[in-house]
Amino acid sequence: MKKNLLPGFIAIFILFLFSCSNKYYTASNFEEKTENHKVVAILPAEVTFTGKQPKTLSPDAIAKAEERESIDFQYALMNSILNHANTKKYITTVNFQDINTTLKILEKNSISVRDSWNKDDNELAKLLGVNSVIRMNIRKQRYMSDEASYGVGVARQVIYKTGIGSKVPVPSSVGKTYDIYASCNLLSDNQTLWNDNYKRSTDYDVQPNVVIEWITDDFGENFPYKEKRKKR
C-alpha cells in the first residue's frame, strides 16, 4: 500500500516545486549584449489604478497617488537589487545610478515622473548616461473598498466557525481588494534583455508598502548581471 502511494506523493511534490518556481526571461545573447555595460538606471515605475476607485478621490488625486507609488517602487527596487547583489556565490557586474541623480536629470530636462513612462528607452539611457534602463509596469485592479473587504473577511470567519464552511466552501479570493499585475524589464538599445512578472491578490489588511516590498523583492532576487565568484 505504501509503495503504491509513493509515486503519487512524488508527483505532487514535483508539481508543487514547479508551481512555486518563478519563470522569467533572459535574452539568449544577454552576455554578448551586456559585455561592456557599466551603469544601469532604474526609471520611475509606471503605476496605474484601474477598477472601482474611491468616490472620495478626484482624478487628480488618483494621478498624484500613482506618481507617489511610482517613486516608491523605484526606490524599493533599488534596495531589493542591492540586497541581492552580492552573495557568497555571486557578484554583480554593474553599478546602479543613484535614484536621486536619475530624478534630478529627468527634472532638469523637464521630464516629469509621468512623462518618463512614455519616453523612448534608448533616449532616456543616453540622457542619463547609462548603458541600460529598468522599467516597471504596475497595474492595480481594485474590486472593492477596504471596508467591504473587511466585511467579507469577517463573514467568512463566521461561516467557518459555524461549520457551514466545511459544507459550502467559500473561495479565499472573494474578499480581495486588489489584483496586482507587475512586470519588470531590462532594456538596452530598445531591446528587452530580461523580463520578470508578478501577480498577487491583496485584501484590506495588507499595507501598500508591504505589497511594494513583495513585488520588488521578487524582481531583485531574479535580476541578472551576476557572475560566480572566483575561488581564491
Language-model features: where?
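Sec-dependent bacterial lipoprotein signal peptides
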Residues: 1-20
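Contiguous N-terminal and early-domain "leader" segments and peripheral loops that mark the onset or edge
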Residues: 2-3, 20, 40-41, 59-65, ...
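A generic structural signal for short, solvent-exposed coil/turn residues
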Residues: 9-12, 32-34, 85, 176
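N-terminal start-of-chain detector that recognizes signal peptides
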Residues: 12-16, 104-108, 153-158
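C-terminal/domain-edge helix-coil "capping" segments
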Residues: 20-50, 127, 140-232
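N-terminal segment of the mature soluble domain
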Residues: 48, 52-135, 139-142, 189-198
